A protein has these predicted regions:
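Active-site neighborhood of thiol-dependent amide/isopeptide-bond enzymes
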Residues: 169-180, 351-410
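Hydrophobic/aromatic-rich core segments of domains that either
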Residues: 191-222, 319, 323, 327-330, ...
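Generic solvent-exposed, charged/amphipathic alpha-helical segments
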Residues: 180, 184, 340-344, 383
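Intrinsically disordered, low-complexity proline-rich tandem-repeat tracts
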Residues: 3-75
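Secondary-structure boundary elements
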Residues: 120-161, 305-370
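Long, contiguous, compositionally biased segments that the model treats as domain-scale units
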Residues: 54-187
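Extended, non-transmembrane interaction/recognition domains
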Residues: 175-326
Length: 421
């Protein structure tokens, strides 16, 4: 065993001087006691108030900037949607059906007090019919039918005649005459009922705006009243008596019957084809046969009234456009004479008595329907074409037994008979 080396002796340390005791710190002043508040009891909780609806903040106004319109985009359906018209409410009014120049007309069927309208001239028929439902239930439909067909005055009278027959065809002719008179009054015509003294035959007295030939007439306060049977046939009588009831409004505003056909009729019918060729001019087309039947026995009026009338605007236009295309519209003596030659030579001649057995002036359209015509018919045709094709001012001139046309050509030096107007 290795002997251990004895450790060095430790030098004793001199004890340090004792430190002076620190002065004792002054004791801190005790803090003042804070007075404690008396303990209060908790307050009763307040009653809950109703919740307040929060107000929506106002949206600030946008600045006034012009808005560019946006074209809406229309969606295209993948399948076409049929355009189905709404179904009209069914008309439950009872109808009466009757024939009018081959057309089936249906108008309201109303009760007519037949037993109260069987006497003439005492006004009782008007009072009884005023108490019926005709004006309220039937008159609007009748006026609508008249407007749809664009019937001129005389054909309104014929439609009323046929309607009255359909309503009370089994009644006496006096009752039917009174019903016709009443309906024509409602249509605005100053037509009077009367009866022939010797036979008691009921008649209707028509006031016209024009003179009517080949008809007997009476005169009352300067107004001519022409005599017609209830069937609107001619009746030649030597003596007649009539009485006019006092009418209340609106029947005071009554008028005469105008025979000039101022508006084309809106009536369809079979067609009659024609072709006219003469002097290098050819005109072809068709006319409405039903209209020809309607005017066959039209009351005879002065010849210029036929030139003022238009039955079918399509027929007028058809002829006039073809004439314009072939001779032009320039107003000169050559064109006027060329048109005159066509009118004089394209038609065969016959008097009315030879062709019909009675005097029958033509409307413009009838010249294209019948195989023959006379001077007054050609004059109407020529005067109409002069006016509508070339705008030539002209007059229809009547000589005893003859009709012709005078023409105004101020830029032409023409020798012959003339007059100044």
């Amino acid at each position: 065993v290795t002997p251990t080396v004895p450790a060095k002796p430790v030098t004793p340390t001199v004890p340090a001087k004792p430190e002076k005791p620190a002065k004792p710190e002054k004791p801190a002043k005790p803090e003042k006691k804070t007075k404690q508040k008396k303990q209060t009891l908790p307050e009763k909780p307040a009653k809950p108030t109703k919740p307040v609806t929060p107000t929506v903040p106002a949206v600030p106004k946008a600045p006034s900037v012009p808005v560019v319109p946006v074209t809406p985009v229309v969606p295209h359906p993948t399948e076409p949607i049929p355009n189905v018209a709404p179904t009209p409410a069914p008309d439950r009014t009872s109808k009466v059906s009757f024939d009018f120049y081959g057309l089936e007309i249906k108008l309201p069927k109303v009760e007519i007090p037949v037993n109260k309208i069987g006497e003439m001239g005492n006004g009782n028929a008007i009072k009884a019919l005023n108490s019926s439902t005709f004006e309220a239930k039937a008159l609007p439909a009748l006026k609508k039918q008249i407007d749809e067909m664009q019937l001129p005055d005389y054909f309104v009278a014929e439609l009323v005649r046929d309607y009255a027959k359909a309503l009370i065809g089994d009644a006496s002719i006096v009752a039917r005459t009174n019903l016709m008179h009443y309906i024509l009054l409602l249509c605005g015509f100053d037509i009077r009922p009367a009866y022939e003294v010797t036979t008691g035959t009921p008649i209707l007295l028509f006031p016209f705006d024009q003179m009517v030939f080949a008809r007997t007439f009476l005169e009352l306060n300067g107004q001519k009243f022409f005599i017609f049977t209830p069937d609107l046939e001619k009746l030649n009588v030597k003596e007649a008596r009539f009485r006019t009831p006092q009418f209340s409004s609106p029947m005071k505003e009554l008028r005469n019957v105008d025979l000039v056909i101022r508006k084309p009729l809106n009536i369809k019918g079979d067609v009659h084809n024609y072709t006219l060729t003469q002097g290098g001019i050819t005109v072809k087309g068709s006319v409405n046969e039903r209209l020809m039947k309607m005017v066959y026995k039209y009351p005879q009026m002065p010849v210029p009234c036929y030139a003022q009338s238009v039955l079918d605007a399509n027929t007028h236009r058809e002829v006039e456009e073809q004439i314009k295309a072939q001779i032009g519209t320039e107003v000169n003596l050559g064109n006027v004479n060329r048109l005159l030659h066509f009118v004089q030579s394209a038609f065969a001649y016959a008097t009315d008595d030879e062709q019909f057995g009675f005097e029958k002036p033509y409307f413009f359209e009838e010249l294209l329907y019948y195989p023959k015509c006379d001077c007054e018919d050609r004059s109407v045709f020529y005067a109409t074409l002069l006016r509508n094709v070339m705008g030539v001012n002209n007059h229809l001139i009547n000589f005893p037994g003859h009709e012709c046309v005078s023409v105004s050509l101020p830029n032409e030096n023409i020798l012959g008979s003339f007059y100044e107007n």
